[in-house]
Amino acid sequence: MANFFIDRPIFAWVLAILLCLTGTLAIFSLPVEQYPDLAPPNVRVTANYPGASAQTLENTVTQVIEQNMTGLDNLMYMSSQSSGTGQASVTLSFKAGTDPDEAVQQVQNQLQSAMRKLPQAVQNQGVTVRKTGDTNILTIAFVSTDGSMDKQDIADYVASNIQDPLSRVNGVGDIDAYGSQYSMRIWLDPAKLNSFQMTAKDVTDAIESQNAQIAVGQLGGTPSVDKQALNATINAQSLLQTPEQFRDITLRVNQDGSEVRLGDVATVEMGAEKYDYLSRFNGKPASGLGVKLASGANEMATAELVLNRLDELAQYFPHGLEYKVAYETTSFVKASIEDVVKTLLEAIALVFLVMYLFLQNFRATLIPTIAVPVVLMGTFSVLYAFGYSVNTLTMFAMVLAIGLLVDDAIVVVENVERIMSEEGLTPREATRKSMGQIQGALVGIAMVLSAVFVPMAFFGGTTGAIYRQFSITIVAAMVLSVLVAMILTPALCATLLKPLKKGEHHGQKGFFAWFNQMFNRNAERYEKGVAKILHRSLRWIVIYVLLLGGMVFLFLRLPTSFLPLEDRGMFTTSVQLPSGSTQQQTLKVVEQIEKYYFTHEKDNIMSVFATVGSGPGGNGQNVARMFIRLKDWSERDSKTGTSFAIIERATKAFNQIKEARVIASSPPAISGLGSSAGFDMELQDHAGAGHDALMAARNQLLALAAENPELTRVRHNGLDDSPQLQIDIDQRKAQALGVAIDDINDTLQTAWGSSYVNDFMDRGRVKKVYVQAAAPYRMLPDDINLWYVRNKDGGMVPFSAFATSRWETGSPRLERYNGYSAVEIVGEAAPGVSTGTAMDIMESLVKQLPNGFGLEWTAMSYQERLSGAQAPALYAISLLVVFLCLAALYESWSVPFSVMLVVPLGVIGALLATWMRGLENDVYFQVGLLTVIGLSAKNAILIVEFANEMNQKGHDLFEATLHACRQRLRPILMTSLAFIFGVLPMATSTGAGSGGQHAVGTGVMGGMISATILAIYFVPLFFVLVRRRFPLKPRPE
C-alpha cells in the first residue's frame, strides 16, 4: 500500500484533505458538554397531600407507589422522601444508557394501578411523573431593582409568566420554584363560624357550588326546528375573579331573608399559594427558579436555550424586574473545554520542538507535524459517526493522542533519513526500503495500542461510559495515525525530503552538532551498558523483582476515588437550625452568612442567592440553601481564590455559628449524581426495627464517624426529628355525639393544613382557592378547641368533646431506599485521605451497629464502588488482549513475554508520580495507566521487532539485540520525549478543569519517564532471556 501512494502523492493529499474537510464539518455539528450522558436516567414521581404529616404520607402515598414499582427494566435503585410539608416523591434511577422515555412509560404504567389506592386529596392534586435529575443546572434569581415590586409580586409574576414557558424548553426536566403565584386565600375565623352555627365544610361546599364554570349549551343548537333563525352560545355561572366576589358568596339564607356571606366569617384576600420559601439575592428580596436537566438532555444546549428564552421573556418584564444567573454549570464547561484546547495547542507546539531537536531538519519535522491535524480532524469525524460529543473526556483523549499519533510518522521519517544517510539512496528509494522494514512494526504498534483500549469500550455503567469516550477517541486516532503513516507520510517523505549523500547527516554545525555528539556518546555508553546487563542478567532480574514489589506496594498505598474534584466556579452552603426553629430565626443566620461572604470573600464572590425553607436534606422553616457564584478563574488567585480554599476558610468561620449547622460544599463531580462532593450512603433498617431504632443507629454511626480522624463533616443529609402535636380522636365519643369521622377529618385538614377547593381567574390565568384557619387560630395547641363540627341532629359539637392533644417527637421528613426505611448519610474524607478509604471506614463502622442495620452506596459513591470493582478486570483483559495480538504478530507464544514484562516498568512510574503529587487512583488515572501500558509495549516492540527479524535471518542473538538497541534508541527517545512533552501541559495546567488534566497527565507523564529510562535496558534483557529459553531456527533470507 505504501508503494502505491509513494508513486501517487497527489492521491494521498486528496485523501488527507477530504479527511480534514469531514472533520471540520463534524466539529461544527458535534454537541459540546462537560461529560457525555453519565448520570443514570432518573424518573421522579411526585404527589401532594396538603396537611399530611411525613408518617401519614409514607403510609398512605409513598409506600403505595413504591410497592407498585415492580418489573421495571434496568432499575438500579429507588429512593423516596415523605415530607411534613405534604409532598411525597419517589425517584427511580436506571442504568446508564436506558432510554428515559421508555423508563417514564414503564413507571406511568405501574403508577396507574396505584392511583386508585391513593387518598382522594392526593388524586385531586394530581400525581406527576417526570424524567429529571436531582441537581440544578441553572438557578435564576429575579429581583426588583427599583423596589417597585415586593417579594410576592415578583414570585407571582415568575410563577405566572416565566415558569411555564421555561419548563417547555427542550431539555428541561423540572423546575423548582422558590416562591409561588397568588391564590385566593380564605382565612376562617372559628368564633364567627360558630356564632352562625356553621362549619368549615359549609364554607368549602358553598365555594364549590358558587365558584364554578357551568357549560350550559347553545340557543338553537342542532338538531333544531325548521326555520330556526338564531344560534348563540349560552353562558351562565363562571369562575369568580376578585376577593370582593368571593366575599359575596352566600353561605346561608335565613328564614327572615337575612344572609350569611363568606365575608362575615372569613378574611378574603389575594395571598401566596405557598408560604414555604423566602428568597434573597445579594441581600435583596427575590424569587427564583431552579432548572433541572431532563435525563439524556445536553446540559450546555439546554442552558443556552433557557437563557435565550429568558432574554425573549425579559422584554415583557414589569419595569424594574431583572433576572440574574445565581448558579450555573456552563461557564465551567466552556472554560474547561477552552483550557483543554489550549493544552492541545501547547502539546502540538512542544511535540514539534522535540521532533525538530532530533530530526534537525525543518522538512523532516514538518512531515509528522502535518499528520497531526489530519488525524485529529479524522478523529472528530469518527466521534460524529459514533454520536459522541466534544467533551472533557474526548478532549483529554485527543491530547493523549497527540503523542501517540506523531510516533508513527516519526518512526517513518527517522528511518528514511537514516537509510539515506547510511546508504546514499534517493528519498523515493529510501522511503520504499524504509516502509519495507518498519511496516510490520507500525501494524504491531497499532494492534497493541488498540488492544489496550478496545476492551474499555465494552464495560457498562457510568464508568464504562467514561471508558468508552477515551477508548473510541484514542483507538480512532491510532488507526488513522497508522493509515496516515502508511499513506500520506511515505508520499511526503518521497517528495519533501532532500537527498543526503552517503555518510552525510543533518546537524553537522552549531547546537545540533553538539547535541549529536552528546547523543552519540551516550548511545555508545548505552550500548555498552546493555551488553553488561546481558552478561549479568541475574542481578538485573533481582532489581526487576524489587521494582515489581515497589509497584504492588504503591498500588496498595495509593488512595482511591471516582473522579477528581474541580473548582467549578461555584458552590453551595446549606443551613440547618434545630427542629422547631422558625423562618425568621433561619433568616437571621442566613444574613450572618451573607455578611461573611460579602465582607471576607468580596474579591472572589460574584453573587449569593439564598432560599430559606429549602435544603438539600428536605424542606422546612429551619433550613436554607445558598448558591455561591464565584468570579471568573482569571480574576481569582490560583491558590487562595479557589473554591476549595474559600470553602475551607468559610468552614472555619461557620463553625463559630452555634445556633445552626452550616456546611459549605463543592458540587458533585458529575451533575445529577448526588448533591455535593464526598461520599453518599443510605443507612437502612433491614429488620424493621422502627424509626426510633433507626435514629439511634444513625446517631451511633455519626458519633463513631466523628471520632475517626480520617473522616470529616459526616452528617445526616436530612431533617432531625422535631416536636409534633398528636391529636387523638375518641371515635366512640364522636359516634355517640353523632359526629361523622369524615367531617372531623375535613375540619382538621381545613383548619390546620389548608384545603384546596377549586380555581379562580386572575388576569387571564387560572389560580387556586384555599381555605384555612386565620393565623391567630392555629398558633397554640389549645386552638383546636375553638373548632366545632355539626352532628347528625344539626347541633354544634366542639372538638374538646371528643379530641385531646399531646406532644410527641416525629420526623418532618421520612426516607426510604430500595423499599427499606433509611437515612441518608453524607460526608467527606479528611485532607490527604481518599474517598475510597473513607468509604471503607464507613463500612467498618456500620458493622459495629446493632444487627439488622446495613448500608448501600448511592449516587457518586455507588459509581465509585462499581468502577473500583471493574478496574482489575479492565487491566487483566487489556493485558490479555495485548498478549494475544503480540502472539499473532510474532507468530510466537514466547516472544510477547519480552514485551509484556516491560509493562510494570511504566506502571511503577505512573503510580509513583501520582502518589508523590498527592493524587488518587480514580477513573482518569486508570485511563492514563492503560495509556502507559500501551506506550511501554510500543517502545519494546520497536526493539523486539528489529532484533527478532535479524535473529530469524540468522544473526547471532546477542549481536542482533545490540544492533536493534543501537538502531532504535533515537526513535524511541524521540517518540517518548514527544509524548512526555505532549502531556506536560496537562500535568501543569491551571484554571477550570485542571483537576482532571492533572489526574490524567501526571500518571501518564510519570509512567512514560520510567518506561523510557528503564525499558531500553530491560527490553533487550527480556528478549535475550526469552530467546535463550525458546530458541528459533534461523530463517533463510
UniProtKB/Swiss-Prot annotation:
Matches recorded under InterPro entries: AcrB_DN_DC_subdom (IPR027463), Acrflvin-R (IPR001036), MdtF-like (IPR004764)
Alphabetically ordered keywords of this record: Cell inner membrane, Cell membrane, Membrane, Transmembrane, Transmembrane helix, Transport
A Pfam family the protein falls into: ACR_tran
Compartments (UniProt record): Cell inner membrane
Stretches assigned to the Periplasmic side: 29-339, 386-391, 461-473, 557-870, 917-922, 991-1003
TM stretches of this protein: 10-28, 340-359, 366-385, 392-413, 442-460, 474-496, 538-556, 871-890, 897-916, 923-944, 972-990, 1004-1026
Side of membrane Cytoplasmic, spans: 1-9, 360-365, 414-441, 497-537, 891-896, 945-971, 1027-1037
GO terms, molecular function: bile acid transmembrane transporter activity; efflux transmembrane transporter activity; xenobiotic transmembrane transporter activity
GO cellular component: efflux pump complex; membrane; periplasmic side of plasma membrane; plasma membrane
Membrane topology: Multi-pass membrane protein
Any GO BP annotation: response to toxic substance
Function summary: Participates in the efflux of aminoglycosides. Confers resistance to a variety of these substances.
Family named by the database record: Belongs to the resistance-nodulation-cell division (RND) (TC 2.A.6) family.
Matches recorded under NCBIfam families: 2A0602, PRK10555.1, RND_permease_1
PANTHER family, per the entry: AMINOGLYCOSIDE EFFLUX PUMP-RELATED, PTHR32063
Protein's UniProt name: Probable aminoglycoside efflux pump
Lineage: Bacteria, Pseudomonadati, Pseudomonadota, Gammaproteobacteria, Enterobacterales
